[in-house]
Amino acid sequence: MSQNLDFLALAGRGGPHYASPTSRHPSPKVWNSTPPSLERGPSERQISPTPDQYTNPNRRRQPWKDWSPGRWQLLQNQRQSWGLSPTAPTRHKRTPEPKPFFRQPRGGATQVYGNHQPGSYRDISHYYSPSMLEDPWAALQAEAQYR
């Protein structure tokens, strides 16, 4: 046991270069083994662990992944029939064409909010002092007309 510990202690410093911690394979079991393709003959070698993308390595089919021709359509039909069922909430009901993103204005929504009549502007005289409200140019024109 102590020899083994000495060997491990040596390995990090100047010890045998194949036991250095920087070598690629960490465990001695891997150092001595030949690659698996050489152990077995070419006849015995597996083709590939996953021959097609829908089979997993231990050879069980994954039924949710395989695409049998009717399956996706069956799901769609199920979903649609749920959408068309009479008791379904209305958000699942199918509309023939998608609604436009910007709502087109309805007839009833033409009113403008505010207490003014359409076509007349709101009286804003109380915002201004009387000197701001009188128009000197109009006064000059009126004087010119009277002359």
From Swiss-Prot:
<dbReference type="Pfam" id="PF15502">
    <property type="entry name" value="MPLKIP"/>
</dbReference>
<feature type="compositionally biased region" description="Polar residues">
    <location>
        <begin position="20"/>
        <end position="36"/>
    </location>
</feature>
<dbReference type="InterPro" id="IPR028265">
    <property type="entry name" value="TTDN1/SICKLE"/>
</dbReference>
<feature type="compositionally biased region" description="Polar residues">
    <location>
        <begin position="45"/>
        <end position="57"/>
    </location>
</feature>
<feature type="region of interest" description="Disordered">
    <location>
        <begin position="1"/>
        <end position="119"/>
    </location>
</feature>
<keyword id="KW-0217">Developmental protein</keyword>
<feature type="compositionally biased region" description="Polar residues">
    <location>
        <begin position="74"/>
        <end position="88"/>
    </location>
</feature>
<protein>
    <recommendedName>
        <fullName>Gastrula-specific protein 17</fullName>
    </recommendedName>
</protein>
